[in-house]
């Protein structure tokens, strides 16, 4: 049970872009007339509904054709195409699936890139064009090991037999950066050594909409950091 709960919460870190500042960047574009609590609830609900709909489609299809639904990237590029081949109109379903996968990948790239671009503009005063050009070169170079890990660098198995460079990068991001980044954000918002609870409440409740309640202060300050830390430790226990 704990493994499933930990995996689900880890997935939430990824899909909601927690711990890497993407939500903060998009939140900065919302004017002061709208409170952040209602916006955050709407995003979380919509994300959950999309995940449930995807699960209702993918899992029955995998079980019907006797394939493993937990095969990671192979599920997208090997397993599901084989499932589509067994369905009437396989070319249409396959084409639509990868088309929508491209849209999903593009939206993710935009979210992550916007965070990096805004960081470069605010910290170093770069123009948007300069920030895009330089970051595109750097990210392309950093992406090469992942791409080459499936062919000419396939002999590199950093996490054991059968693993790839992508598995290592996924472990670094999903099991380290996302939970630890979320923990830093959380402690910054509630700790007197950071922004502080009062400043957080003032900012969260500015404007119109759903107010952020005061009653979960103890939970957010003391219990929630322990939950995030547990997810981080659980990821290492399952991996090693």
Q: What does each model-found stretch correspond to?
A:
Residues 106-111, 132-135, 139-150, 167-202:
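Hydrophobic alpha-helical segments of multi-pass membrane transport proteins
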Residues 158, 162-187, 209-240:
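A generic transmembrane alpha-helix motif of multi-pass inner-membrane proteins
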Residues 112-126, 161, 165, 187-213:
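Alpha-helical transmembrane segments
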Residues 1-106, 130-131, 138:
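Membrane-embedded translocation segments of transport machinery
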Residues 46-52, 91-94, 103-106, 120-156, ...:
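Loop-to-transmembrane helix boundary motifs in multi-pass membrane proteins
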Residues 38-46, 207-218:
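Membrane-interface segments at loop-to-transmembrane junctions
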Residues 1-2, 31-34, 57-70, 88-92, ...:
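Transmembrane helix-loop junctions in multi-pass membrane proteins
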Residues 17-32, 103-118, 182-200, 239:
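Transmembrane alpha-helical segments in integral membrane proteins
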């Amino acid at each position: 049970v704990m493994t499933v709960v930990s995996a689900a919460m880890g997935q939430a870190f990824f899909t909601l872009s927690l711990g890497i500042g993407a939500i903060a960047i998009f939140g900065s574009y919302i004017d002061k007339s709208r409170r952040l609590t209602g916006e955050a609830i709407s995003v979380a609900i919509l994300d959950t509904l999309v995940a449930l709909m995807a699960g209702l489609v993918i899992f029955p299809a995998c079980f019907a054709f006797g394939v493993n639904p937990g095969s990671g990237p192979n599920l997208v590029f090997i397993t599901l195409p084989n499932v589509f081949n067994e369905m009437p109109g396989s070319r249409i379903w396959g084409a639509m699936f990868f088309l929508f996968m491209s849209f999903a990948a593009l939206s993710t790239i935009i979210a992550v890139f916007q965070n990096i671009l805004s960081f470069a503009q605010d910290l170093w005063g770069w123009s948007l064009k300069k920030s895009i050009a330089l970051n595109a070169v750097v990210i392309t170079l950093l992406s090469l090991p992942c791409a080459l890990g499936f062919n000419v660098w396939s002999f590199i198995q950093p996490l054991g037999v059968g693993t790839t460079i992508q598995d290592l990068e996924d472990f670094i991001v999903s099991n380290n950066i996302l939970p630890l980044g979320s923990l830093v954000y959380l402690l910054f918002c509630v700790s007197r050594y950071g922004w502080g609870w009062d400043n957080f409440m003032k900012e969260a409740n500015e404007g119109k909409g759903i107010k952020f309640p005061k009653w979960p202060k103890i939970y957010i300050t003391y219990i929630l950091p322990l939950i995030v830390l547990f997810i981080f430790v659980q990821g290492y226990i399952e991996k090693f």
